[in-house]
């Protein structure tokens, strides 16, 4: 692993940070072929063989530059052969090699100094899934308005390439990238949000994820710059957000009039702070201030996408709602803020008063309908939520079948333990439990009732409901009654690093 990194640093220093020559290095494709997506980039090349030969890669790139091979019909795109080689296989090798070429130098450049390394470490902590759960608990109950928006996808690959071009300065690399993208990839399947992630997972083309993440990073850097600047403006300066026409000649008169006649209205803008949360392509803007400020930021985002990134976004796709009126969907939860009215009796001498207090409570609800739809797609139940057997697992041993179902149930229960209402989660566990029983009965060629009767009891499958509760009771067995009540409520687990596969139902 260290040898690859040394070679790469030497190549970059010799070429003065030009990336195109790295495409023709043999070890790059060794890294790409032996790369484990869940592990480090520098992995051992256990499976490295002639399938990732540099000679074949050079031949493919040469054929790409030939004019008569720039246009390939859709019918031949999956079965076309290059001198006896499968084109899809080697297009994936080139793509993986290109992704490593652009990812590793970027990481080396960003970690070149200790100060930059600390900045990167700081932002990595902020941009993890762990920072979103405390935001739910600590901030949402004090905010009034939320804007639910999805970052629009680029309508053309050239937009992604141009955004990446701001960082690198290698013209041959971009020329090769354009040829590769247009000849080997069908972008029409990628611009649809519902097909984007599934297409990426099937093709395993990391270069697309890299370019898209670069696009999102560029957008967020501009947005956060504007947000930080606006939050540091003084009260008199920020008042111009009511109407831009007062910014120049009429600013003094404007401030004087508002300070005299509309001081109560102006006080809403004393804290022009916007909370921004994003996970994957879904973003949330939340604010404590009036809806006028949220509408301003909505227009800023639309104009930023249209004029800077050439991405069209309909204004109606960004909706602004009050927390108490409508919930929003993020990270597999439906979240809203419920208002609880309580009356407190206060007595002073002979007079008694009833004081109404409004308490805000955050509710995170498990979306049962999308989850049942995901379970039905995975063949654990039908579309109505009735459990069915899993025939493809019937050939496994009883232990493997139970272990697979328990693993899925444990993951869902682990992730959704942050919900304020567990009833929907118990229903999902019930579906998985009966599906497991029906799968075991199908394997033993018996009915469910006969299978359970032969076992004598249902204790074999009680782990679906008792395992997690038993673990938590052991953790808090010596704690006070207050702590024992806490673990029965909402818990955000800190070992969650990504959203569960079954939760990606959109």
From Swiss-Prot:
Q: One biological process GO term for this chain?
A: RNA splicing
Q: Name one Pfam family in it.
A: MatK_N
Q: Where in the cell is it found?
A: Plastid, Chloroplast
Give the matching InterPro entries: Domain_X, Maturase_MatK, Maturase_MatK_N
An example GO CC term for this entry is: chloroplast
Q: Which UniProt keywords apply?
A: Chloroplast, mRNA processing, Plastid, RNA-binding, tRNA processing
Molecular function terms from GO: RNA binding
**Which domain of life does the UniProt lineage start with?**
Eukaryota
Record function comment = Usually encoded in the trnK tRNA gene intron. Probably assists in splicing its own and other chloroplast group II introns.
Provide the family line: Belongs to the intron maturase 2 family. MatK subfamily.
Name of the protein described by the UniProt record: Maturase K
């Amino acid at each position: 692993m260290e040898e690859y990194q040394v070679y790469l640093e030497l190549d970059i220093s010799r070429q003065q940070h030009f990336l195109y020559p790295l495409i023709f290095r043999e070890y790059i494709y060794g890294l790409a072929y032996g790369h484990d997506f869940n592990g480090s980039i520098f992995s051992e090349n256990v499976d490295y063989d002639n399938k990732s030969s540099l000679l074949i890669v050079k031949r493919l790139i040469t054929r790409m530059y030939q004019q008569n091979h720039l246009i390939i019909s859709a019918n031949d795109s999956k079965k076309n052969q290059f001198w006896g080689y499968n084109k899809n296989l080697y297009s994936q090798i080139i793509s993986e090699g290109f992704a490593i070429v652009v990812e590793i130098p970027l990481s080396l450049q960003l970690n070149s100094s200790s100060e930059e390394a600390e900045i990167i470490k700081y932002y990595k902590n902020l941009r993890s899934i762990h920072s979103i759960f405390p935001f739910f608990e600590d901030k949402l109950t004090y905010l009034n308005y939320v804007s639910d928006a999805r970052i629009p996808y680029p309508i053309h690959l050239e937009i992604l390439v141009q955004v990446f071009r701001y960082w690198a300065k290698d013209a041959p690399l971009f020329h090769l990238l354009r040829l590769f993208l247009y000849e080997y990839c069908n972008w029409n399947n990628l611009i649809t949000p519902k097909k984007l992630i599934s297409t990426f997972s099937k093709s395993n083309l990391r270069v697309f994820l890299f370019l898209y993440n670069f696009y999102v990073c560029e957008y967020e850097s501009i947005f956060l710059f504007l947000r930080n600047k606006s939050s540091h403006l003084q009260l008199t300066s920020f008042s111009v957000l009511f109407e831009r026409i007062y910014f120049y000649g009429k600013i003094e008169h404007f401030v004087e009039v508002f300070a005299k006649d509309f001081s109560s209205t102006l006080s809403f803008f004393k804290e022009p702070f916007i909370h921004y949360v994003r996970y994957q392509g879904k973003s949330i803007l939340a604010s404590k201030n009036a809806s006028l400020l949220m509408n301003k930021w909505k227009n800023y985002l639309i104009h930023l996408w249209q004029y800077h990134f050439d991405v069209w976004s309909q204004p109606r796709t960004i909706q602004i709602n009050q927390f108490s009126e409508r919930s929003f969907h993020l990270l597999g939860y439906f979240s809203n803020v419920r208002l609880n009215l309580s009356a407190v009796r206060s007595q002073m001498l002979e007079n008694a008063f009833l004081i109404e207090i409004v308490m805000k409570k955050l509710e995170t609800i498990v979306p049962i309908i999308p989850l049942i739809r995901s379970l039905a797609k995975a063949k654990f139940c039908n579309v109505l939520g009735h459990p069915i057997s899993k025939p493809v697992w019937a050939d496994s041993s009883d232990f493997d079948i139970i272990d697979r179902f328990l693993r899925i149930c444990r993951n869902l229960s682990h992730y959704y333990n942050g919900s304020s209402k567990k009833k929907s989660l118990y229903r999902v566990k019930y579906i998985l439990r009966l599906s497991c029983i029906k799968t075991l009965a199908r394997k033993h060629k018996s009915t469910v009732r006969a299978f359970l009767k032969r076992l004598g009891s249902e204790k074999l499958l009680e782990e679906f409901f008792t395992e997690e509760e038993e673990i938590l009771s052991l953790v808090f067995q010596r704690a006070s009654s207050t702590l024992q009540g806490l673990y029965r409520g909402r818990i955000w687990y800190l070992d969650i690093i990504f959203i569960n596969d079954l939760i990606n139902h959109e």
